[in-house]
Amino acid sequence: MPTRVNDGVDADEVTFVNRFTVHGGPAEFESVFARTAAFFARQPGFVRHTLLRERDKDNSYVNIAVWTDHDAFRRALAQPGFLPHATALRALSTSEHGLFTARQTLPEGGDTTGSGHR
């Protein structure tokens, strides 16, 4: 199936990917994460996020968060209100993370003409 090479559409957009290994209960982690997500959702430049849990491992999660640009993401992390959220997540989990930019996209339905591509 064809993919679309990044053609400058949303070229500034960045995706933060964070993989968590949870040491406490999944329900507690998800509750703390929901509060963290609500904090980020109020920040300028936040686009969306998805928290995924691995099917066969209750303690393995991945968060995928999209931001309009790197500066917006950086400003959100610098907000004084972020530290309590980071501390709460670190108390329940360890994580690995990275900031990514799109290189190829396959829009829903496999449309490579550009309609439906975001």
Curated annotation (Swiss-Prot):
Keyword Oxidoreductase among record annotations: yes
InterPro entries: ABM_dom, Dimeric_a/b-barrel
Family annotation (Pfam families): ABM
Impact upon substituting residue 29 to M: Oxygenase activity comparable to the wild-type
Swiss-Prot/TrEMBL site (Important for catalytic activity) positions: 18, 63, 67
Domain annotation ABM: ranges: 14-100
Catalyzed reactions per annotation: deoxynogalonate + O2 = nogalonate + H2O + H(+)
Keyword Ion transport: no
Resulting phenotype, residue 18 to A: Loss of monooxygenase activity
Name assigned to this protein: Deoxynogalonate monooxygenase
Species classification: Bacteria, Bacillati, Actinomycetota, Actinomycetes, Kitasatosporales
